[in-house]
Amino acid sequence: MRQALPLVTRQGDRIAIVSGLRTPFARQATAFHGIPAVDLGKMVVGELLARSEIPADAIEQLVFGQVVQMPEAPNIAREIVLGTGMNVHTDAYSVSRACATSFQAVANVAESLMAGTIRAGIAGGADSSSVLPIGVSKALARVLVDVNKARTTRQRLTLFSRLRLRDLLPVPPAVAEYSTGLRMGDTAEQMAKTYGITREQQDALAHRSHQRAAQAWAEGKLAEEVMTTYVPPYKNPFAEDNNIRGASTLADYAKLRPAFDRKHGSVTAANSTPLTDGAAAVILMTESRAKELGLHPLGYLRSYAFTAIDVWQDMLLGPAWSTPLALERAGLTMADLTLFDMHEAFAAQTLANLQLLGSERFAREVLGRAQATGEVDDAKFNVLGGSIAYGHPFAATGARMITQTLHELRRRGGGFGLVTACAAGGLGAAMVLEAE
């Protein structure tokens, strides 16, 4: 094992995660229909600051992410600062790392803290799959640019006459990889076939996720970390995730048809995470700054790692690559963890990564490591359910996982937790958290 890389400031301060909060997560075109991501971000950051009672000028930086970006608000972070009553001099910029976006936001704020340029910052992300940047065809876009430069009506009419009827159709955001044309579900199907993951195994994991998430809500474990929201016309509160199917049975999952490989596939809408709207954020500080303000941190960021692999085959293996690196940098092993939380983009992807974490062959032949990262104990794995149940607003999921894991660690008396996610483009992210 290589030497650990402690995440501390020049003064020896640990990176404290003081608090975290999220909106309820809503299935596409339901509770947050018509609410853009920037407004979801304002909701969660405004409420997070109000609950924390931290002076507004104590926050020196806000790093926020959005995967499905809206052209009218390209820097969502700055819009959140300006729309929440934060100090207008607060540094704010946006990041995007697909499904690991808020992991990246947290890492960026942590690096600013370690560099000594700030002492407190906010990291998070928001996405809306209900408010989308619906575009136009390339042919129409080109004509519109040329029409804007045309000088006469005749020139404009000539340009428009070149268009065909199909060129006028709206173009929704792409759901496929730019470089390969593969959809995420196609990759999940690849992984199911490569690693021999059955439909029954996928449905069982999805059912487990929903059951555990429903139980977490029923036991009141999520109430402190999920805010109540009100949206126009402001008559009814929206306070709980609306994707969780607590009353479902395994037989219900078996009824669904494959969503991607229609003839021979096993990936369905039920064993995949749905399109979702929501936002989440966390406040980070140096340990000494938290003490100055009289705050008791939820926990600390012990390490993080980002990795990348090829996109043509089984590209959602990010957790199998990033987990051993994050553990190594934390000076820990799998056995040292109290909790292990993995983003469930698809049940097939989740099960494939779990399989490879325990594989000696994968460790030696692919990672170049002497031994496997380690089997993940089921009693430590996604104990409150995962993204299949809660949903997945792309840029918000990492902050949800971090906050949720730290709260659960504290309920268990402290310890170490690892959160990890795959992401489009063959990317992976993992973070080791510590609670006392």
Curated annotation (Swiss-Prot):
Coiled coil: none annotated. It catalyses: an acyl-CoA + acetyl-CoA = a 3-oxoacyl-CoA + CoA. It is found in: Cytoplasm. Its EC number is 2.3.1.16. It comes from the Bacteria. Its main location: cytoplasm. GO terms for cellular component: cytosol. GO terms for molecular function: acetyl-CoA C-acyltransferase activity. The keyword DNA repair does not apply. Pathway: Lipid metabolism; fatty acid beta-oxidation. The active site is at C99, H392, C422. PROSITE patterns: THIOLASE_1, THIOLASE_2, THIOLASE_3. Keywords: Acyltransferase, Cytoplasm, Fatty acid metabolism, Lipid degradation, Lipid metabolism, Transferase. GO terms for biological process: fatty acid beta-oxidation. Belongs to the thiolase-like superfamily. Thiolase family. Catalyzes the final step of fatty acid oxidation in which acetyl-CoA is released and the CoA ester of a fatty acid two carbons shorter is formed. This is 3-ketoacyl-CoA thiolase. It comes from Salmonella paratyphi A (strain ATCC 9150 / SARB42).
